[in-house]
């Protein structure tokens, strides 16, 4: 990175990710002679944490969790309303999300764009496209990037799954295009396993991601 169009960077993360950026900002200043003003956004339990002390500025998000819709307690680093207030209050010009929390939230990248704040990462539109494994594989193919043989799109019926499996050969994988963490994925070693794997992958994907779509 050289000649950034921003100076005040809010860190929407904590612990090691936050410290890594603070250190990188100092190294950038030494190398380029341009200062990046780091702003640590922290919650109450972290008020004495190293990343809070080492940042140029710190802003409290309050309690570590908030009550989200549905009555669930979630991290305050996921509370868009609170984050928006913090970004405005600190006059942040850019946001570094690190990893986890809002780092892969397209809606948060959109929020930053609406506020005129640079999101250091991909755009919300790009996240949405690459977050879907079917769309991302199609984009890769369009760019002539080699990809493993696959169904070429969603496989909606068992009949189509059998046709694609015959073309691809066994063993193969059935995978949901959304989410991750090993959910919605099944290994199929032979034709006798296909039906159960296809139905269970779709069922698990719907429960985990609200979408029954799968591909081979």
Regions flagged by a language model, labelled:
Residues 1-216:
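N-terminal beta-alpha lobe that positions the nucleotide/phosphoryl donor
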């Amino acid at each position: 990175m050289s000649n950034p169009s921003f100076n005040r960077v809010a860190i929407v993360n904590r612990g090691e990710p936050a410290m890594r950026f603070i250190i990188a900002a100092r190294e950038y200043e030494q190398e380029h002679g341009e200062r990046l003003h780091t702003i640590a956004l922290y919650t109450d339990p972290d008020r004495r944490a190293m990343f809070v002390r080492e940042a140029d500025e710190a802003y409290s998000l309050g309690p570590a969790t908030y009550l989200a819709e549905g009555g669930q307690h979630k991290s305050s680093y996921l509370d868009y309303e609170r984050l928006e207030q913090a970004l405005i209050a600190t006059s942040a010009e850019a946001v570094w999300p690190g990893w986890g929390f809002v780092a892969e939230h397209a809606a948060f990248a959109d929020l930053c764009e609406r506020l005129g704040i640079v999101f250091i990462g991909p755009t919300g539109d790009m996240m949405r496209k690459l977050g879907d494994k079917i769309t991302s594989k199609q984009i890769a193919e369009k760019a002539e990037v080699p990809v493993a043989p696959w169904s070429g799109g969603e496989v909606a019926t068992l009949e189509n799954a059998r046709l694609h499996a015959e073309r691809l050969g066994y063993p193969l994988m059935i995978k949901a295009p959304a989410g991750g963490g090993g959910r919605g994925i099944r290994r199929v070693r032979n034709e006798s396993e296909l039906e159960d794997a296809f139905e269970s992958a779709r069922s698990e994907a719907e429960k985990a991601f609200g979408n029954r779509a799968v591909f081979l």
